[in-house]
Amino acid sequence: MSDLMPTLPGLSPVAGKSVVAKFDGGLLSSDGGLLLLREVELRLRVAERLAACIKDPRAPDQITHSLADIIRFRLLMISAGYEDGNDASSLRGDPMFKSALDLVPSDRDLCSQSTISRLENLPDAPTLLRMGGAMVDLYCASFHQVPKRIVLDIDDTFDAVHGDQQLRLFNAHYDEYGFQPIVVFDGEGRFITCALRPAKRPGGKEIKAFLRRLLRAIRNHWPRTEILLRGDSLLRPGGARLVSRERLGLYPGRRAHYDLTPSYRRPRGQHESSLRGRTKAG
């Protein structure tokens, strides 16, 4: 009977050994999905991209866990639902996590909670900006050809915290402490970048600085691509002036109250026509 049980093909080898996933019981793990996340990481190399932005102050001859491995372990922890860095103490010897980092169960343990904490406090402001730019580079690299136009959906979102995290702030609207990061997706729902910030509405100066860096990073890859911004009151007049100066298209959301000039109406109308065409075709 077990010979008829299907297997999950296509998993990459770990330390030169083949990996076979079956569904016939035996020793089970609730974190078996880490092997699939490993395949995503092998393709995208997110940990390596972020690690390349950080200057490692450690002595090279005394390093056991590379920055990329520490980041990769942390990303996998969060993806598997272990958001607390303290969980690393019990997960560093877990065979599934080891396999996801190209180690066999008998190999050394992964990094400790204290190592993760030191890494998370290592980046300064310029380093964080480089890391945000690395995510934009990853987004642009995901296209097989240069797009003629992209839509950037820009918004902020509330993220509650339950400790004494740095930058946490009480938000009266949500009646909780937390962060209020700015997040950017494209019109197809693909993540582009984000900026962690205190739980308050960003001002016009902050939005302009964020947009300026984002646009510069995108245009380093696609100088001729038309960019259409879509947002609500987050794109307040300070952001609107930047839109005009950078010759962008603006597609406000429901809470914005801008008097759109013809240069704004044209790309908005084109985008709405495109959406109607897709709806009819579907």
Q: What spans do the regions from the language model cover?
A:
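Acidic, His- and aromatic-enriched active-site or binding-groove loops in soluble protein domains
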Residues: 174-178, 212, 245-259
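Dynamic "connector" segments at or just before major functional cores
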Residues: 1-202, 208-221
